[in-house]
């Protein structure tokens, strides 16, 4: 009898999610931005859909957008209790965090998908790892803190906050908003100034970094990702590892581009539930979970000391 651990597949649902994540991301982008003709007209959709926040980072000013950006909405109304919309936005984000956590980042965020597409562009040199840059991941929590507190301090005469993140740092605003609007409208082009130049530099920097690193904005700068990360350990959607199947080969950790070892911390704040670990696992030990169950706990597994059959 062969002493080596035989390979096996992940549960059907987990395998499906991991295999077709790219398709799910594309569908999420289209559902978030269905008003494609507006891109040619240079017009922003202002229907009832704009009263609903989408889960991922998607600019309100995008001509094709059907919903509001949660970060922009929070900054605009968090400074005053006069706006009932502020309670709705906060409640929506908390609900998404509890239900999905950073699954939103891995499957539903348009800007996250954009960075992944850029990262797939082949370069002469090997893609760089961000493992040595892990301390930078805490920067997004500082940005989240400033994103929430600054609009509380600086409000206009009607109590609306100044959206500092959207105004000075968010590259998605340039990519989805300013660029398509300026291409379609001469008046918008003539109104562009130093702020557009600065944010174009920010977008350009993110594009260059995305060529070298996997989702750098998500890892280091995104306040929305930082918010969802706070819920990763309690969210109903996440990852789990079957200790009885795990052979501790380390393939899942090597496959993870978010620098997470799922066998040690299945619900790590940096995990975006992308499923790369599911595809890499030779024994089907790693899978998605949905619900309160956290799966089998880690314990000594004699098979883990044996080599995995290649």
Predicted regions and their residues:
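Non-ligating segments of multi-cofactor redox enzymes
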Residues: 1-263, 269-310
């Amino acid at each position: 009898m062969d002493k080596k651990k035989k390979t096996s597949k992940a549960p059907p649902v987990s395998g499906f999610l991991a295999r077709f994540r790219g398709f799910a991301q594309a569908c999420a982008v289209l559902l978030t931005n269905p008003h494609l003709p507006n891109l040619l007209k240079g017009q922003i959709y202002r229907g009832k859909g704009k009263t609903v926040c989408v889960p991922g980072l998607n600019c309100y000013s995008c001509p094709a957008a059907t919903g509001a950006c949660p970060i922009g909405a929070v900054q605009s109304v968090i400074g005053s209790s006069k706006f009932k919309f502020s309670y709705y936005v906060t409640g929506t984000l908390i609900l998404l965090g509890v239900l999905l956590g950073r699954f939103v980042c891995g499957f539903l965020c348009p800007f996250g998908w954009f960075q992944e597409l850029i990262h797939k562009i082949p370069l002469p040199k090997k893609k760089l790892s961000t493992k040595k840059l892990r301390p930078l991941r805490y920067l997004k929590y500082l940005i989240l803190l400033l994103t929430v507190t600054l609009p509380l301090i600086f409000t206009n005469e009607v109590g609306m906050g100044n959206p500092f993140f959207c105004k000075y740092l968010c590259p998605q605003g340039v990519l989805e908003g300013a660029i398509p609007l300026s291409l379609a409208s001469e008046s918008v082009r003539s109104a562009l100034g130093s702020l557009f130049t600065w944010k174009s530099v920010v977008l350009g920097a993110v594009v260059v970094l995305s060529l070298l690193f996997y989702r750098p904005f998500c890892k280091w700068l995104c306040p929305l990702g930082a918010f969802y990360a706070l819920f990763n350990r309690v969210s109903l959607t996440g990852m789990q590892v079957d200790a009885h199947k795990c052979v501790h080969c380390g393939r899942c950790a090597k496959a993870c581009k978010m620098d997470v070892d799922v066998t040690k911390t299945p619900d790590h704040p940096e995990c975006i539930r992308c499923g790369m670990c599911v595809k890499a696992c030779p024994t089907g030990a790693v899978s998605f979970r949905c619900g309160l169950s956290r799966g089998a706990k880690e314990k000594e597994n004699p098979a883990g000391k044996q080599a995995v059959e290649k």
